[in-house]
Amino acid sequence: MTETSIAAQGTVAAIGERDEFSALLQKEFKPRSDHARSEVEKAVRTLAEEALRSASVVSGEAVKTIQSIIAEIDRTLSEQINHILHHEAFQTLEGSWRGLHHLVNNTETDEMLKIRVMNISKKELGKTLKRFKGTAWDQSPVFKKLYEEEFGQLGGQPYGCLVGDYHFDHSPPDVEMLGQIAQVAAASHSPFIAGVSPTTLQMDSWQELSNPRDLTKIFQTPEYASWRSLRESEDSRYIGLAMPRFLSRLPYGAKTNPVEAFDFEEEVEGADHRNYVWSNSAYAMATNINRSFKEYGWVSRIRGIESGGAVEGLPVHSFPTDDGGVDMKCPTEIAISDRREAELAKCGFMPLIHKKNTDFAAFIGAQSLQKPTEYEDPDATANANLAARLPYLFATCRFAHYLKCIVRDKVGSFKERAEMERWLGDWILQYVDGDPANSSETTKAQKPLAAAEVVVEEVEGNPGYYTSKFFLRPHYQLEGLTVSLRLVSKLPSGKGA
C-alpha cells in the first residue's frame, strides 16, 4: 500500500471520527437554530484540528474533552488579561473611572446639585496655566470656564467645589500649578480638592507612612522652600489634598468578583498592593461634600465619624497569610494612627482613616493646604485657624456666591446706605441659629452661623457705591479633647456641700 493511500485512509478516518463526534455534540447540546448548529460544527472542527495537531485521542465523553480544552483557553486568557489589568497605565485609567463612578453612584443629583466632568489631564492643565502666568492669569481658558462663564455672568451657576483626579507633590512644576489653581479657585470661591503623592514625604508608597518619626521635620529642608511658601499664601486655603487612595474594587475571581465570560482568577498578592486598583480619595471627600449639600443645603458636615465624614461600603478583600491565617487588605492602603493623623492634618493634608476590621473609613479632619498664620493677637490667630478649615470655608464661599447674585439684581434700584445695610442684615439672619447652645446638630447644619453682622459704608466721591463687610461666626466643630483622669476621695462639686 502506498503512502498516498495510507494518508488518504487516515484523512477519511479523521473525517469519519469528526462526523461521529459532531453528531454526539449535536445530541449533547441540542442546538435549536442554524446559528447555534453552525457554532457547534465550528467548535468540532477546532477540536478535531487541535486533537490531530497534538496527536492525542479525543475522549468518548465530549463534555469532559471540551471542558479540558476550555480550561486551557481560560488559563491562557487569564495570563494575558492579568498582564493588561496590572499595567500601570491601565490601572490608573481604571482607578479614575471607578473613582468617578463612586462619586456619581453615591450622589443624589437634581436641579440644585449637578456634576460636570471636564476631560483634561494634569499635563494639559499645567501647560494651559503656564501660558498665562503672572498678570495674565485671568485670561486663561481655565479662569474663563470656571469664573466668567458661571460666577461672573448673569444667570450663571457658580461651581461649589472643584475636584481634580490628580496627585501633587513638592516638585517645582506641581507647586507652581497648585498656586495657579488656587488663584482661580479663590476668584471663583470654589475650593479645589485633589490627591497628594507619597513622594511629597520622600516615600515610594503610603505603606511607608509609619516609618518617619516626625513628619514636620521633612518639610524644613531647603528643597521644600517653595512648598512652604505656597502653604503660607492666602489663596492656598482653597486647596484640599486628600490621601491615601481607597480600594476601587475587589480582585476578580470565583469567590470574590466572578467573571461570567470565562473562568478568570486575578493574580494578587495580599501583602503587595501594586496589583490592586486604587482611586483618588478626593472622590471620597467629594461624595461627602455632595451628601452634606443634599441633606442640609450647606457643606458643613463633611468630617468626623458621626458628622458626615464617613466613607462606607469599601471593598474588603481577605487573603491567606504565610503563617496559615487569614488577613484583610486595608482598603485605604495603610492604617493611620490618631497621632499620625494629627501630624498629617498639621502638614496640610486630609487623611482618610480606616476603621480596623471593617469596610468603614472616615475623614476625621478637613484641613486645607494653608498653614494658618500665628499673630500676637489670639483672636486674629483663631480667625486664621478657622479660615484654613474647609467646612467653614465652604459656608463662606456659598455666601459669596449668593451675595454677588442678589446684589447684582439690586443694581439700579433706589437704596440708601442704612436701607441696604438693613436689607442685607435681614437676609443673612435667615442662616443664623437663634439658640446655638441648645439647638440640634441638624439645625446647626441647616443654619451654619452662630452669629453674623453686616456693615455697609459709602464710597466717598462715588455716589451710589458702597462697600460692605460681613462678619460671620460659624458653629465651632470639635477638634480635640484633652482628658485628665484623677482618683479622688470626694468629687469637687461636693466639697462645698
Q: Where are the regions a protein language model picked out?
A:
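Eukaryote-specific, cytoplasm-facing alpha-helical/coiled-coil scaffolding segments in long proteins
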Residues: 123-128, 189-191, 429-431, 494-497
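Structured, hydrophobic secondary-structure cores that serve as assembly/anchoring elements
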Residues: 69-89, 107, 291-307, 311-497
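A glycine- and small-residue-enriched flexible loop/hinge signal that marks low-structured segments
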Residues: 2-58, 108, 120, 146-402
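A short acidic, often aromatic-flanked loop/helix-cap motif at beta-alpha or helix-coil junctions
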Residues: 122-126, 201, 462
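Extended assembly-interface regions of large multimeric machines
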Residues: 48-132
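Core mixed alpha/beta domains of very large multi-subunit molecular machines
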Residues: 97-116, 126-156, 173-183
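Short, surface-exposed amphipathic charged segments that create phosphate/polyanion-binding patches used
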Residues: 130-135, 207-212, 470-471
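Amphipathic alpha-helical scaffolding segments
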Residues: 98-101, 179-187, 422-426, 487-490
